[in-house]
Amino acid sequence: MIFMSFQPFTTASQSFAPVQETVEGGVYLRLSEQGVILGNGYFSRTYQTMGGRLSAGGILNRRVDGAAAEYLPGEASQEFILRFVSGRKRAALSAGDLTIDSLSYADVSGGKALCISFQPSAVLGLPVTVRLVAVLKEQDHFLREYIEVSVPEQQADSLTLDSIDLLSFHVQQGQKTWSRPEMEPANISGFHMGLGQPVYLGSLFLGCEFPAADTRIEEHTARTRYYSGKSFSHLKKTDGVFLSWPAVLGAARSDDREVLQSDFFCYIETVSTKTEFRKQYNSWYDHMLDITSENIVGSFYEIEKGLTQHGVAPMDAYVVDDGWNDYSKGFWCFNEKFPQELYPSAALAKKFASHFGLWLGPRGGYTMDTPRFAKHIQKAGNGFRNPKSKDICVAAPVYQQGVKKLFLDFMQRFDLNYWKLDGFALRPCPKKRHGHMTGGEHDMYFTTELWENWTDIFTEMRRQREEQGKSLWINFTCYVNPSPWFLQWVNSIWMQNSGDHSFQIPSKGGSKQDSDVDRMMTYRDDRYFDFVYTRELQFPLAHLYNHDPIYGNTVKSPRTKQTIQATTEEFRNYLYQLAARGTSFWELYFSFHMLDEEKWEICAEVLRWAEAHFHILRNAKLIGKTPAGGDVYGYSAWDGAEGIVSLRNPANFQQEYEITLNRLIGVKEDAADMGCTQVLPYAAKPDGKAYRYGDGVKLTLAPHEVRILRFGAPDRQAARLHVAKAAAGNAVSLCFDKRVSTEGARVLLNGVQAKLTLCADYHTVIAACQEAFKPYEAVQIEAALTDCAGNAVKETAQVVYYPDDLIFRADARPGAVLAERGIEGEGDFTLAFPLSTEDADAVLLAQDGAFTAAVDVDGTLRFTVGSVCVASTKPVNDGKRRSVTALREKNGMLKLYLDGALDASAYCAEAINEALPAGEVRAEKLPGGTVRLINRALAFDEIAK
């Protein structure tokens, strides 16, 4: 086993000392008449050792409101139960059956470890030695327990480990508990769907760090069960002993389930793979299986253009989905549509200052070719066919080693930073000759080995990227139990209980005339309710992959039978509703031609807003009732005294809803003096009230309305004018760094009040006057308006109207001044010139303090704007004539085009759109040709012309 967060250690590897007296500290060990107490400032455990036998003592939780809460396991409780098989014989060995040999402790990083060693005990004629290790750290509100088991090496073949129960606590009558319910199948069986969940006992949570452990309350006993089915000769060992997966016991602030869940999720975040906000494009709903190397490149270019020209930071990845594999071959390989494999797509993503991602379906995809592909793989000796599910047996070691080799190879060759691993074991495979485990209750021998091997593969994938100083996002999709403990290896997991997309009409207040995106939201959010409230799966929504947003040409409307359509407002509601769910992972399933200017503006604004508020949104909780019944529902997310609450009315009639600002929806008890701004529908100023913990908020929602409220300290910083430019012969564009309002606004152009239009992003104002501007003359701007926080905004600016955005066009000669005034400010621009030189270490063009274009000592072309620099991928000082286009985009990215083709890009998040001072533009050593400076960033298709 390879652990991502906590690595159990053998007792032989640490310096353990006898526990002979009380040991104080941030983590303490105290001897009592009953035994030994292990504790810290959050909680403590008593291990009863009376009579030389171990029994489960009380647990004291100091985190609860008021007095500390004590949990007392029932008399039948056991710290562990081991079950063995030898031939047809079975035996069980409980902690209480063993005689304690010694108590010892060791100092470990940040805490202490307690070891309880037992005298060897005969099991089915073989001596078995067990040690219990409990590890507690000073800063943790949870401890871990695991056991160390050994048998004589020469007899290891004779004894099989069936299963282990850890923290087997008998639940006494009247104790408040929660355990996962019996649930319906979601492609995989209901039993397997429920694996890897915690149990709640009073104000405690209990679980196992193996994501396929069977943890639940059964017959009045809470326990976490690990299945094996392997003989001790085949179990993985460390220093000759078998180490179990750790069980976890944690303390929460309350026995209320919502609070328990929040505190459990806090623990999960400590063991999870680092996961931040992520945005990327995926080809699936644009082309589905009809992707080619050419149309992928075309879509990448168009999506990047739409996002970049609206100020969105570079995507975290551009992803090729299914359609690249040749399903007629004996293993994963490229079909004839990808003659250069993925090199063109991967290279283009890099040229966007982005990364590349890829889909692979371990089971063989989801097409009519899947069963045949499994047969081809078996015939080629690269794996086997699972007869139960008629797909690839994903547990066969030969196949696992083959795909691991492919993963590592593809990451090396194509620099992949994202994998969409789509489809694992739909049904447990019964064929032992495939080289994997079979049998056990609910086929759990198969399931345990399956996920132990796959998590080892994920570890190897991450290790390769980490050694290269690079990141990796693993998206774990279909036929996976959504256990939060998988997050030790993966970043996101598909919700399992949903289709990729669908359309649903509420049973109350719904109509066949409901919009496409309304029906899509109702469907997906109903699946969220099924996930959270029906199945009661304890999984943080920030890590839940939900296949949204979808706005692609392959999705057909049930109303029109044509490609789905959304109005500007419907599209805005759709994206904000997705943001409110708290997902960290935005995979844009878009077709670029379906997004008009307003939709691009909205997409850019929502992505910026969601990322800026992700520290809040990542804590989202569902509130209300499922939209399937037409009821108001939403999401509530809080980080300290900052909160975002969304509500949606899925019905076609008006409805009322009241929110109570308490900890059940995530509000901290000390929250006070909070202001409230309405994000959606956009309200230009706060409501002027002060809110505190426990307050109620009554709302009336119009039919199909999405309402989003943001709570927190009042924002006193007024919006700032970010970029001002002439947008036409009689209009200027004013872009602010926050939302603004044009209501009552006063914007003067050369002293005359302008007609104002607020753009769909709510950040940009178009101010137009009746008289045309004079070419190449300054336009004086005076603006007085309010921002979304109600702050008064007063700005003055001066812009020059350049017909066709051309600042100048001039013939270059060495040392010549091409223009007295070039570019200035934080905006985008383009510099274009021809180049034919053999010089090195030579400045070609420059505007002091703003930009330089130069040939470096190695012959590469370098374009520097402020403190950001982009270099060509190859030398340009070979004397050949070529055209150069260098530009800064609206999102601050620098790009270099050579002969009309994108060659390289650079982006620095710490130096976005640095303000550039005005100044003269000079040709230094540029030998000649016509130079153009343009007051906007040209798009790739304009440059190619």
Question: Which residues make up each language-model segment?
Answer:
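Aromatic- and carboxylate-enriched substrate-binding clefts and catalytic-loop regions
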Residues: 314-551
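Flexible glycan-contacting loops in extracellular carbohydrate-active proteins
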Residues: 806, 903-929
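Localized edge beta-strand/strand-to-loop motifs within extracellular or lumenal beta-rich domains
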Residues: 880-894
